[in-house]
């Protein structure tokens, strides 16, 4: 009897630590077609696992309002979120935030040290500000500022390039202005470094 009771307690603990939404949810399945079965992301579709729920919510709102206007957003995300109600959006954000993220580790390791310096200190003489100031010392993000650590190199590189071209993430995002000061070498170094951050 004691052994059965212990097994039941273990099952209860494991169940309570899992994300609260079942993976069979239609809304979750719709997201994982592009973002991966474990929400760990692909080349152009970012990892959602472990992302800050406030950020996910803000981006759903930006897609719905067409404020996030890069090509992939227009082609896929504007229509993908059109039918989401506020409660489902919140549930999705909390579900994905609760999944343990895996690092991409796919950048150029020889550029990581340079990228770390740019991330922490910026390049003042080139008007490149520190990423640390907003995204935190370990690129973990805060509130609706996203977690960057461990995102895929090609996704990060592409987003930085798009911001530099004037595309937006939302009406209040400073990233187009910030990225406009980054050259190709700085972008490659930053994206490489961030892909290795735990």
What does each model-found stretch correspond to?
Residues 47-54, 134, 147-154:
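Short cysteine/histidine-rich metal-coordination sites, predominantly Zn2+-binding motifs
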Residues 52-63, 153-167:
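Short microdomains enriched in Cys/His and/or Lys/Arg
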Residues 15-28, 38-46, 98-124, 146:
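Electrostatic cytochrome c docking/interface patches
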Residues 42-49, 63-107, 142-147, 164-198:
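Axial heme c-ligation environment in periplasmic c-type cytochrome domains
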Residues 24, 28-66:
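The feature marks the first
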Residues 30-37, 92, 128-138, 190:
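The canonical Cys-X-X-Cys-His
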Residues 1-4:
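Positively charged n-region of N-terminal signal peptides that target proteins for export
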Residues 7-17:
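Bacterial N-terminal signal peptides
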């Amino acid at each position: 009897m004691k052994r059965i009771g212990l097994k039941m307690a273990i099952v209860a603990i494991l169940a309570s630590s899992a994300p609260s939404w079942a993976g069979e949810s239609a809304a979750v399945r719709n997201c994982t077609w592009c973002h991966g079965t474990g929400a760990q992301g692909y080349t152009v579709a970012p990892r959602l696992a472990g992302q800050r729920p406030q950020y996910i919510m803000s981006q759903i709102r930006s897609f719905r309002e067409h404020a996030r206007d890069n090509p992939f957003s227009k082609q896929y995300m504007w229509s993908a979120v059109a039918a989401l109600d506020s409660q489902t959006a919140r549930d999705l954000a909390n579900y994905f935030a609760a999944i343990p993220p895996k690092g991409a580790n796919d950048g150029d390791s020889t550029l990581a040290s340079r990228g770390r310096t740019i991330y922490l200190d910026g390049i003042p003489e080139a008007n490149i500000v520190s990423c640390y100031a907003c995204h935190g010392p370990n690129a973990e993000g805060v509130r609706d500022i996203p977690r960057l650590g461990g995102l895929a190199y090609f996704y990060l590189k592409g987003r930085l390039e798009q911001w530099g071209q004037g595309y937006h993430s939302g009406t209040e995002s400073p990233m187009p202005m910030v990225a406009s000061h980054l050259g190709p070498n700085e972008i490659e170094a930053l994206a490489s470094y961030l892909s290795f951050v735990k």
